[in-house]
C-alpha cells in the first residue's frame, strides 16, 4: 500500500463575474487553465451576470465570491447584507464613457444632448456615468440614456448611440482592434472612488 497521504477533497467555490466572458477576468482563466486553483484544493466555478444580483447571492452564501464595485458593497451593507470587500482588483476605476473619435466627445460637458448607451441603471457603469455627468454639472435629464445591455461596442460602432459606458478594457479595445479610434472619458480624471474588487461574505472569511 502506498504511504502517500490521500489528496484533500476539493472545496467548491462559486465566483460571480458581473459581465460576460472578457479579458478583464484573464487571471481567473489562466489560474483554471494552469491548475493553480486545483493545486490549492479549490474547484472554482465561474458564473456571468449582473453584479447587483451576485451581491445578494454572496450575501446569503449561495456564492462565496464576486467581482464587484466598491459602491455596491456600501449599498449592500446599508441593506444589511454581510458582504465584505477583501481585495482590490483595479487600481483605477475601470469604467469609461467612450465614443468614436469623430464624434469629438472628449470631456463630460460634451455629453449634453447626446445619446449614451449603458447596460442598465446599476453597478459600476452607472456609478461612472453619474460621476462623469456630475463633473460637468449635468444630470441624466441632460442626456438621452438608453439601456443597451452588454452591446456597447456594437452600439457605438453602428452609430446606434453617440457614446457608451463600458470597461476600458472592453468596448474601446474592441473598436481599436477593428481600426476605429475612440475618445474616452475616465471617471478617475474627475472623481476618485473605490474601484472594483473581490467581494465575499462574513461566513466565508
Regions found by a protein language model. Name each.
Residues 42-44, 58-68, 80-83, 114-117, ...:
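Alpha-to-beta junction loops
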Amino acid at each position: 500500500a502506498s504511504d502517500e497521504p490521500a489528496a484533500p477533497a476539493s472545496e467548491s467555490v462559486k465566483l460571480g463575474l458581473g459581465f460576460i466572458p472578457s479579458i478583464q477576468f484573464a487571471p481567473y482563466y489562466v489560474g483554471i487553465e494552469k491548475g493553480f486553483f486545483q493545486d490549492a484544493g479549490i474547484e472554482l466555478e465561474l458564473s456571468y451576470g449582473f453584479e447587483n444580483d451576485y451581491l445578494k447571492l454572496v450575501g446569503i452564501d449561495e456564492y462565496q465570491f464576486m467581482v464587484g464595485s466598491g459602491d455596491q458593497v456600501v449599498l449592500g451593507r446599508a441593506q444589511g447584507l454581510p458582504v465584505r470587500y477583501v481585495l482590490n482588483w483595479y487600481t483605477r476605476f475601470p469604467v469609461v464613457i467612450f465614443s468614436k473619435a469623430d464624434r469629438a466627445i472628449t470631456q463630460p460637458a460634451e455629453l449634453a444632448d447626446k445619446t449614451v448607451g449603458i447596460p442598465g441603471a446599476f453597478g459600476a457603469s452607472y456609478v461612472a456615468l453619474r460621476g462623469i455627468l456630475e463633473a460637468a454639472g449635468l444630470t441624466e435629464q441632460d442626456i438621452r440614456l438608453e439601456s443597451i445591455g452588454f452591446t456597447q461596442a456594437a452600439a457605438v460602432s453602428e452609430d446606434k448611440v453617440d457614446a457608451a459606458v463600458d470597461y476600458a478594457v472592453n468596448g474601446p479595445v474592441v473598436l481599436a482592434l477593428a481600426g476605429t479610434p475612440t475618445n474616452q472619458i475616465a471617471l478617475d480624471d474627475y472623481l476618485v472612488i473605490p474601484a472594483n474588487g473581490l467581494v465575499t461574505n462574513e461566513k466565508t472569511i
